[in-house]
Amino acid sequence: MTGTAILWPMIAHAGLVVALYALLGLRRGAAVKAGKARVSQFRENLNEPEDSLFARNSLSNQFELPVLFHVVCLALFATDGAGAWAVAVAWLFAASRYVHAFVHVTSNRIRHRQPAFTAGFAALIALWGMLAVHLLRIA
């Protein structure tokens, strides 16, 4: 495994963010075209139609917990601590974000979203633990 393998789950997550921006644009455009919203409503996110609201909320979620994901991946990369286990767990986190986002922009059922969030959160905790152990070993 190369030292750059930890960067691929980060790239995958960035792809999700791009896809969610595109989906948000499509859903907002459809809402305006259908007369369910005016463009001016989106300036301050007032009374957003449900379809685009779910996409907007899912996009917003990508700038919460995942920020810590990108930081820990970069720290593992910079300290040469991105072994096979760390890369596998990083992929688990990225996959959990895709599942979470898919549920968020479709049914938006908490009982389906929560397990994906929990899996990602556990993966993130594991990555930070791996970084801490790695730093203790190289100190």
Show the residue positions of the predicted features:
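Core segments of transmembrane alpha-helices
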Residues: A14, S60-A75, L124
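Interfacial loop-to-transmembrane junctions
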Residues: V99-A123
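Alpha-helical transmembrane segments
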Residues: I6-L23
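Cytosolic, membrane-interface loops and tails of multi-pass inner-membrane proteins
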Residues: A22, L26-R56
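Mid-chain, well-packed structural core segment of small domains
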Residues: P66-V99
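Juxtamembrane boundary at the C-terminal end of a transmembrane helix
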Residues: W128-A139
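Hydrophobic residues within alpha-helical transmembrane segments
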Residues: A12-G15, L59, A88-A95, P115, ...
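Membrane-water interface of alpha-helical transmembrane segments
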Residues: G3-I11, D80-V87, I110-F117
